[in-house]
Regions:
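Aromatic-enriched
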Residues: 2-13, 184-211, 355
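Glycine-rich, anion-gripping cofactor-binding loops and their flanking helix/strand elements
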Residues: 60, 80, 232-317, 420-451, ...
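Phosphate/pyrophosphate-binding active-site segments
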Residues: 2-19, 154-157, 218, 310-407, ...
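Active-site diphosphate/adenylate-binding microenvironment
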Residues: 25-29, 33-35, 43-56, 365-451
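Glycine-rich, acidic loop regions that bind phosphate or pyrophosphate groups
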Residues: 2-7, 119-161, 259-363
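Thiamine diphosphate
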Residues: 46-134, 281, 290, 295-299, 324-326, 332-334, 338-342, ...
């Protein structure tokens, strides 16, 4: 069982915790609780003490990370694992700024979060430099590139409505983190505002335009070679059921992006799985006469590094208007993916055995042939160790276990080859920052238990990315969080090594001195083991059967499959 910090649970009847005087911090806690929040991530700080004092009088569970960036990753993981809003408390200045890389990932991937950052007292705000601790010229401006919106709350009575509005914005598509900041004195000063009794936040409706759905149906009804790219928006919009129905009506091959991994059944006869970076898949998608793109910008990875040159028409569905037609012209439908696909599915009336032919080949046979080509290409590249390593991990992981992947060679393989089954695949593919996997997994495990569905999760990192979040071993131990952390240690930044050797013939500044990860984990009180690559499956199974956190270290040098956008 996860152990939350002492002093953050409700006091027994007749007893009090913290001070007896209500303040602005109480309004924050009360509003969050009324909105359904149960857990908060963050680190205490001087200007934020009013928040933490108030938590002592409320029911919010608090998970304290060791670095604010990891707190942001944890709140992100909490949201991805549960579908709920992640909540993050930050202190002023350095604390707030340290969170920004984590927030960039949430913003890029569309993860709903409410961020409450403290501020210096009101009297210090503005153009004057009063020399207050942690003072920034404009703190919320620093968050502008990584959050949907930013707001300064200047009086206590405005706190409940501001948080309610932020929650609504966070869950409205396109989803993402919303930034609020509250000055120290507004959090600490006594208030006359009564306790918050209720709060309601509902996502704004984001349906597709009727005429655009009608036009898309017209295109698809006459298409001979329809195909579908399912991006991350498919999962965020919970559109999996509609996607399956549409694909089967059209007999359209479906490929998932890294963010869309799991949106379509891996073993379905129309599934091209997630081999989005393979040239055989790029060729197939280019040959589609109508291509449906859901929740994807057709960006760098999805377009096979901008080599994708579609010859047919594109129907692009996305809640973010800036994404539509940003890389390829088409029929742009600005809408939530769930609502758009439901409308398209309802309007698309076609027999299940609708005639479809890709130049004389049935779509189902084309899928088999394409996957066979991918398999043959991989088998021609001396990648037996890598293929077995990923297969052994997949075999060891229970079908319903959620996994969190850092930016590491194993994750890049996972983007293409990981069958999520009944679990979920989460990675830092949005912004691509290092250090995501372990703290996000911590947040995910906390979320599952908090919502009454406890379960172990897996984090996967390289030795380079592991050092970004190594301090969170203390967090995992303190809260007894059921996370198994697989660290694949190749002695450096493995993917950078490959990139540099490929581009320049040699690698520079990619080799790393690193600790003995087993001894380091044990120093935190976390059980750890080091195994050979061929034993990774058994080691993971043992870790999954244990209680609390544990670490599995594998020292091995993995290679990536050859890129195909360069003609390979």
């Amino acid at each position: 069982m996860i152990e939350f910090d002492p002093g953050t649970a409700a006091a027994p009847a007749g007893e009090s915790k913290g001070t007896s005087q209500r303040n602005g911090g109480d309004l924050v806690v009360e509003t969050l609780e009324a909105l359904g929040a149960k857990t908060v991530f963050g680190i205490p700080g001087q200007h934020a003490l009013g928040l933490f004092d108030a938590m002592g009088r409320g029911n919010l569970h608090f998970v304290s990370s060791r670095v604010e960036n990891n707190s942001a990753f944890a709140a992100d993981g909490y949201s991805r694992a549960t579908g709920e809003v992640g909540v993050l408390f930050l202190s002023t200045g350095p604390g707030a700024l340290t969170s920004l890389a984590g927030l960039q990932e949430a913003y890029a991937t569309g993860v709903p979060m409410v961020v409450v950052a403290s501020q210096i007292p009101l009297e210090g705000l503005g153009a004057r430099r009063k020399g207050m601790l942690h003072q920034l010229d404009d703190q919320k401006a620093s968050a502008a590139n990584v959050t949907k919106s930013q707001r300064l709350i200047q009086h206590a009575s405005g706190i409940p409505s501001a948080i309610q509005d932020a929650w609504t914005e966070a869950i409205s598509s396109p989803q993402g983190p919303v930034w609020l900041e509250i000055p120290q004195n507004v959090l600490l000063d006594p208030i006359m505002v009564p306790p918050v009794e209720d709060a309601l936040a509902e996502a704004a409706d984001n349906p597709p335009r009727v005429e655009l759905v009608r036009e898309a149906v017209k295109w698809l009804s006459t298409a001979e070679r329809p195909a579908i790219i399912a991006g991350g928006g498919t999962r965020r919009g919970r559109a999996e059921k509609s996607l399956l129905s549409i694909a089967e009506k059209l007999r359209a091959p479906v490929i998932c992006t890294p963010g869309g991994n799991g949106a379509f059944p891996w073993t379905h006869e129309l599934s091209l799985q997630s081999w989005i970076e393979d040239r055989h898949m790029t060729d197939l998608l280019e040959d589609a006469d109508v291509l449906i793109v859901i929740g994807s910008s057709l960006g760098e990875v999805t377009s096979n590094y901008f080599t994708f040159a579609p010859r047919g028409r594109i129907v692009q569905i996305d809640a973010e208007p800036r994404v539509l037609e940003s890389n390829s012209p088409g029929l742009g439908i600005r809408a939530d993916a769930g609502q758009a696909l439901a409308a398209l599915d309802e309007a698309l009336v076609m027999p299940v055995d609708a005639a479809r032919s890709w130049h004389g080949t049935a779509p189902e046979d084309l899928v088999k042939e394409s996957l066979a080509k991918v398999k043959a290409r991989l088998e021609s590249q001396d990648l037996g160790k890598e293929l077995k390593f990923m297969s052994d991990i997949r075999d060891a992981v229970p079908a319903d276990m959620q996994t969190f992947w850092d930016m590491t060679i194993s994750a890049y393989w996972g983007w293409s080859c990981w069958d999520a089954r009944q679990g979920q695949f989460h990675s830092a593919q949005g912004a691509g920052g290092l250090g995501y996997g372990f703290p996000a997994a911590i947040g995910g495990a906390v979320g599952l238990e908090t919502l009454g569905n406890p379960g172990r999760v897996l984090a996967v990192s390289g030795d380079g990315s592991a050092m970004y979040s190594i301090s969170e071993l203390a967090t995992a131990k303190q809260h007894n969080i059921p996370v198994t952390w697989l660290i694949v240690d190749d002695g450096g930044y493995g993917i950078m090594r490959e990139y540099m050797v490929g581009a320049f013939g040699k690698a520079t500044a990619t080799e790393l001195a690193r600790p003995d990860f087993v001894k380091l984990a044990e120093a935190f009180g976390v059980p750890a083991t080091r195994v050979a690559p061929e034993d990774v499956g058994d080691a993971l199974k043992a870790g999954f059967a244990a209680h609390g956190p544990n670490v599995v270290v594998v020292e091995t040098l993995l290679k990536m499959f050859a890129p195909t956008h360069l003609g390979g």
